Each structure stands twice: as C-alpha cells, then as structure tokens.
C-alpha cells in the first residue's frame, strides 16, 4: 500500500493502515504540503483547545511512524495506474516503486491573488478559510473577496463573528445563486463593494488596512480592516491521476457513495482532493480513515499487500 500526500487525510490513512499491519509507504513530499503547515492556531480540531498547524501535522507524522508507516520525504512525479501493480515514480533519481493499492490524498490549494502584502500578512489577518480562521475576524471589520456561492456563504458566516463584513466583487454582479445573493444583500452587517479589487494589504505586525481599487474609475480607496479572506476558489492537486481516474469538471477525484473507492479498483482517494464542499482537516482525517479501511478490505479480498 502506498499513500501519496502528507496532510491529515494521508496521515490518518497511514495510521490506520499501519495499525492494520499493512506497513504502508507514505510520500510526504520534500516539503509537507498540507495547508495546516501555513496555519497558525488551529482551534477546531478535536482533542486540542488550540494547537499550531505545523505542530498538529508533526504529531500526526510521529503517530504514523509509530504505527509502522514508512515515511518518504520525496515528491511523487508520476503515477502509472493503467495496470496493477501501480507504478509510482519518485525522488530526484526517478526511482519506481510498485504497489497493489494506492491512497491518493494530495489535497487542494486555495487560490490567492498575490497582491502586495499578502505573503507578509498570511495568517496575520489574511486567510482563505473563514471556518478555519474565523477568530481572526472576531469583533473586527473584515473583508471577504469573491462573488460566488462560497464567498457569500463565508461572508454570511463571518457576519456572526465580525463587527462588519465588506464583500468585494470584481464585477457589477454576483456569480452566486439568487438565494445566496439575497442572503448577503439582506444582511445589515454586510456591505457589498462592486467593480473593485484589493490593490494592497497593509499593516505593522498584523493587517490594519487595505487599498481598494475601483476597476471602472481607477480610484484607490483605503479601507480600515483587520482581517481579509480570499474566497475565489480552490485547485485540487490531482494532475498525477488526470486521465486515469474519474474526476469532476473541476478536477476533483470522484469517489463512490459512502466510500473512498475511485472507479479504478485498488485506487482510493481521501481529503480535499476529493472534497470540494467541506475542506476541513477533521473531515480529511475521517476520509483518510475510511480510505485505509477500504484499502485493507480490498487488499484482503484481492490477494495484495
């Protein structure tokens, strides 16, 4: 059994598979790519009142190794899933490892706009997950950027926590459904700013101001806020299996109902690479557990290891 991905989905799979005696190999990458690695305080993971994202990942890595997983800090560069055993190409020397079962848990990446100040203030007032980092916005003036259903949903969610929410759209109309648009328009704590884009994020140790450019007039207006959330979409990291397993139009791996099975026997998916709805660490970990149990049973029935 090979697991590709070093986030909570892949690591939970490694823990369960290790405890089942499968001696799984898990590829964590040269640098662990879990979004938790760029998260400061995690306050919604059961068992921890608060924990730093990298510390949570390291705890899971240590537990996976303790349970018998073999850790490879290398990138997987190619997967040949056309026939069993599957071929996994990895590392600088393009070595090939074969396996009878594969759990793919490479996650997704939140899209950002790479404006001035974004990197400097990432997790210091700037985030791409309102549910994960809502405490950044507590009793603060907050910005949400985006015009789709997710942006409207997150603006509505944050309106219960922030003192005020500015919803910034590049266009003069929403892409969201009529019901979601009505929800934000009728919310007295949400102010909608049309035809605009964030030009720069400013602050000292944390965000305290952004510059907003009107895309029609070109005027730039300062806006005093202390939190900003990008809600402009996610990109699933599934290119290694593109054309080999069934995916959605947006590139998310499709799994069979109530399981982590893909349409290819012996290949399972877990975490955000197959979840475009919840995108939470605890959900990813749960799906990693399911994937390991599915893989264990599948291997037992198909004579693999």
From Swiss-Prot:
It is an enzyme of class 1 (oxidoreductase). Binds 1 FAD per subunit. It is found in: Cytoplasm. GO terms for cellular component: cytoplasm. InterPro entries: FAD/NAD-bd_sf, FAD/NAD-binding_dom, Ferredoxin-NADP_redctase_2, Pyr_nucl-diS_OxRdtase_2_AS, Thioredox_Rdtase. Its cofactor is FAD. It holds the Pfam family Pyr_redox_2. Keywords: Cytoplasm, Disulfide bond, FAD, Flavoprotein, NADP, Oxidoreductase, Redox-active center. It catalyses: [thioredoxin]-dithiol + NADP(+) = [thioredoxin]-disulfide + NADPH + H(+). PROSITE patterns: PYRIDINE_REDOX_2. Its main location: cytoplasm. GO terms for biological process: removal of superoxide radicals. SUPFAM superfamilies: FAD/NAD(P)-binding domain. FAD binds at residues 28-35, 272-281. Disulfide bonds join 129-132. Its EC number is 1.8.1.9. GO terms for molecular function: thioredoxin-disulfide reductase (NADPH) activity. Homodimer. Belongs to the class-II pyridine nucleotide-disulfide oxidoreductase family. The active site is a redox-active disulfide bond. NCBIfam families: TRX_reduct. This is Thioredoxin reductase. It comes from Spironucleus barkhanus.
């Amino acid at each position: 059994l090979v697991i590709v991905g070093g986030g909570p989905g892949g690591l939970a799979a490694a823990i369960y598979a290790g405890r089942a005696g499968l001696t799984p190999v898990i590829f964590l990458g040269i640098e662990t790519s879990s979004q938790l690695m760029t998260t400061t305080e995690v306050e919604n993971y059961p068992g921890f009142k608060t924990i730093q994202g990298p510390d949570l990942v390291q705890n899971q890595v240590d537990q996976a190794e303790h349970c018998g997983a073999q850790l490879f800090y290398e990138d997987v560069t190619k997967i040949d899933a056309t026939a069993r055993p599957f071929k996994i190409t990895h590392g600088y020397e393009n070595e090939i490892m074969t396996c009878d079962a594969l759990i793919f848990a490479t996650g997704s990446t939140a899209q950002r706009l790479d404006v001035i100040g974004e990197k400097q203030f990432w997790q210091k007032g700037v985030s791409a997950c309102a549910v994960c980092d809502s405490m950044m916005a507590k009793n603060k003036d907050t910005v949400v950027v985006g015009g789709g259903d997710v942006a409207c949903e997150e603006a509505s969610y944050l309106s219960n926590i922030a003192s005020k929410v500015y919803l910034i759209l590049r266009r003069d109309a929403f892409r969201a459904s009529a019901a979601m648009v009505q929800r934000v328009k009728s919310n007295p704590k949400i102010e909608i700013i049309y035809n605009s884009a964030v030009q720069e994020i400013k602050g000292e140790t944390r965000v305290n101001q952004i510059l907003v450019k009107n895309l029609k007039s070109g005027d730039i207006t300062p806006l005093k806020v202390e939190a900003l959330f990008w809600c402009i979409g996610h990109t699933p990291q599934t290119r290694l299996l593109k054309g080999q397993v069934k995916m959605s139009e947006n590139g998310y791996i499709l799994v069979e109902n109530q399981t982590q099975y893909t349409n290819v026997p012996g290949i399972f998916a877990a975490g955000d690479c197959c979840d475009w709805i919840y995108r939470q660490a605890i959900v990813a970990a749960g799906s990693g557990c399911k994937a390991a149990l599915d893989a264990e049973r599948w291997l037992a029935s198909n004579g693999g290891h």
